[in-house]
């Protein structure tokens, strides 16, 4: 990797970079694009993005390396809510000549990419066990996009990544192929802004940020993004757009960490942290409410700040605030287990052999996603402590923890529990049965009406 995780002066870095040795024929556009756009990666971001673009009337090619994933999408087995499954079914039956829009084609054949006028790269960018970026999928996707790039195309990276990545994985390799970016081909970075399960802020209404290598790159990328965003906000460079995404999710991680700390302090003082935060939120300026919880999950908040920290370490720059916040956030599941032991002890019940149910294992309400969910670590730690653990989640049928597959309890209210951990409450969830449970550990801080309720 040219930057080796370092923050560099991107202007000097790229001004001295040699152009490719194989010139390509100048072309303003490809005359026979069969698709308006191709979306590379059909996961939690790529598939909704492809659907939004198709819904706007564009001809969309959806590309994923996994034939199994494509088969699941076609069969309606994909990790989508019911409404989105219906959108997929409708899109797949739309004929290219239909007046409602264009084609919606799913494939694992990357050789079709030259038929798309724009290519959106929407693949996961997780972290590894050392908290360093795992760029395996991103490198592969960008390499595929570059290998199949043709004059007149616009390539847009949307995956969260380090500052300088767009130039490293797209701009440089394209130049090595002989393209002149901004003339033959166009490159931009537009970080995804999708919040699964959020019906209030849907993708088509949320503004998008875009930074391009040249003004023409921005113009072309924005023309596409306007089809699936509320508006488009242009910044001066791809690096500014990359840093924007890191700032957004680091902001959330730091504030969640502070909310957790205030929750612990408030419990010690006998105060209700939810009441405190709600009261503070009446201030119309200088405040934004963040609520405490059992930890953070998904592939955004637990991961994205580590892309920045990794890059800073490469430049021998420290960020103690962010580092401390991420350490505290990561330690939250351990705190949950400690509180379980304490609450059970208050009832003279030993953790060993205790019957514990986790209510909700998805990382957030309204989704079936368990990636990086704190619930998984909580389950594993409870088992190590000797507890017998079950879970109940109306959106998640099974989870695998420590090599053991668990199945959701269908009727949790009909069984006897020593303690129930309320981890995730999906919209419309029935919690009336919790009033009959002897001990409830409410990690959502939202069930103040329960008699036998404890908080973290």
Tell me what each language-model feature is.
Residues 2-456:
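Structural/interface elements that position substrates and couple domains in central-metabolism enzymes
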């Amino acid at each position: 990797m040219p930057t080796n995780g370092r923050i560099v002066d991107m202007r000097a870095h790229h001004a001295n970079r040699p152009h490719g040795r194989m010139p390509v024929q100048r072309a303003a556009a490809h005359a026979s694009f069969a698709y308006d756009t191709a979306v590379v990666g059909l996961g939690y971001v790529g598939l909704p993005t492809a659907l939004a673009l198709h819904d706007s009337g564009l001809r969309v090619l959806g590309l994923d390396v996994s034939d199994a994933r494509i088969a699941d999408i076609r069969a309606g087995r994909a990790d989508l809510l019911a409404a989105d499954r219906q959108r997929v079914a409708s899109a797949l039956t739309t004929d290219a000549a239909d007046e409602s829009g264009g084609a919606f084609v799913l494939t694992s054949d990357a050789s079709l990419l030259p038929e798309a006028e724009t290519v959106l790269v929407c693949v996961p960018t997780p972290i590894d066990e050392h908290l360093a970026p795992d760029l395996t999928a991103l490198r592969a996707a960008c390499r595929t996009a570059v290998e199949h790039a043709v004059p007149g195309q616009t390539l847009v990276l949307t995956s969260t990544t380090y500052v300088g990545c767009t130039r490293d994985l797209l701009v440089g390799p394209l130049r090595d192929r002989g393209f002149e970016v901004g003339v033959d081909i166009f490159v931009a970075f537009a970080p995804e802004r999708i919040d699964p399960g959020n019906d209030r802020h849907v993708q088509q209404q949320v503004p998008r940020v875009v930074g391009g290598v040249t003004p023409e790159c921005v113009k072309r990328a924005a023309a596409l993004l306007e089809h699936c965003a509320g508006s488009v906000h242009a910044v001066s460079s791809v690096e500014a757009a990359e840093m924007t995404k890191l700032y957004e999710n680091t902001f959330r991680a730091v504030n969640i960490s502070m909310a957790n700390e205030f929750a612990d302090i408030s419990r010690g003082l006998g105060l209700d942290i939810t009441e405190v935060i709600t009261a503070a939120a009446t201030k119309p300026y200088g405040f934004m409410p963040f609520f405490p919880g059992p930890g953070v999950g998904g592939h955004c908040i637990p991961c994205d700040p580590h892309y920045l920290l990794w890059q800073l370490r490469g430049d021998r720059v420290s960020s103690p605030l962010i580092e401390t916040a991420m350490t505290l956030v990561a330690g939250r599941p351990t705190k949950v287990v400690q509180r379980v032991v304490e609450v059970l002890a208050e009832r003279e019940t030993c953790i060993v052999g205790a019957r514990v149910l986790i209510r909700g294992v998805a990382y957030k309400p309204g989704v079936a996603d368990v990636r990086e969910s704190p619930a998984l670590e909580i389950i594993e730690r409870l088992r190590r402590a000797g507890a017998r653990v079950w879970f109940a989640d109306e959106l998640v049928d099974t989870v695998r923890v420590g090599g053991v597959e668990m199945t959701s309890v269908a009727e949790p209210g009909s069984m006897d529990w020593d303690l129930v951990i309320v981890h995730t409450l999906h919209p419309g969830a029935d919690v009336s049965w919790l009033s009959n449970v002897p001990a409830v550990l409410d990690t959502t801080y939202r069930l103040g009406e329960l008699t036998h309720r404890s908080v973290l």
